[in-house]
Amino acid sequence: MAAENKEIPVVSIVGKSDTGKTTLIEKIIPELTGRGYRVATIKHDVHGFEIDHKGKDSWRHKKAGASTTILSSPRQVAVVEDVEKDHEIAELRDKYIRNVDIILTEGFKKSRHPKIEVFRADLEGNIIFRNDEKLTAVVGDKPPDVNVPCFNRNDVNGIVDLIEARFLR
């Protein structure tokens, strides 16, 4: 089912820290793949990250000055590339992602892509993206007063039904 010559749809899972964004994505992925879709994810980390391990050969390549290092095995490929700016989702999609039907992102709060906000009433007073025209749904423990579909965080089938209807057909 992988998208070939059309733009791959992107859905951003957004919300404040500790609301369950990663947990929701972990539940959505197997439901989508179980329905036959291929899924890519992009996680934004404002704090930076280290994918490599000190002392490993690829780490030593980077430490020696390589601007790009590719780790390749029979089962996976990883690219570690120095960048001078934060990349937009479209740039990452166009450069690194192919042969998938949908991209789920986490942490790209400023993106112009459709958003599903994860909400916890005990952590937040208000929905962050209430007035964002790209807000597609809210997932949480207590339905807020918004003009988009609201789902309980355990209603993975309902959430994926919405994603499938809006972005995959």
Name each model feature, range by range:
Residues E81-K110:
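Phosphate-binding/switch loop-helix module in NTP-utilizing enzymes
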Residues K21:
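Conserved lysine of the Walker
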Residues K27-E84:
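N-terminal phosphate/diphosphate-binding loop that engages ATP/GTP or pyrophosphate donors
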Residues I102-R169:
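Phosphate/Mg2+-binding loops and adjacent switch elements
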Residues V10, T41, T69-L71, K115, ...:
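Conserved beta-strand scaffold positions in the cores of enzyme catalytic domains, especially
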Residues K16, H44-D45, K54, S73-P74, ...:
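Fold-independent oxyanion-binding glycine-rich loops
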Residues M1-V14, D18:
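Extreme N-terminal, non-catalytic leader segments
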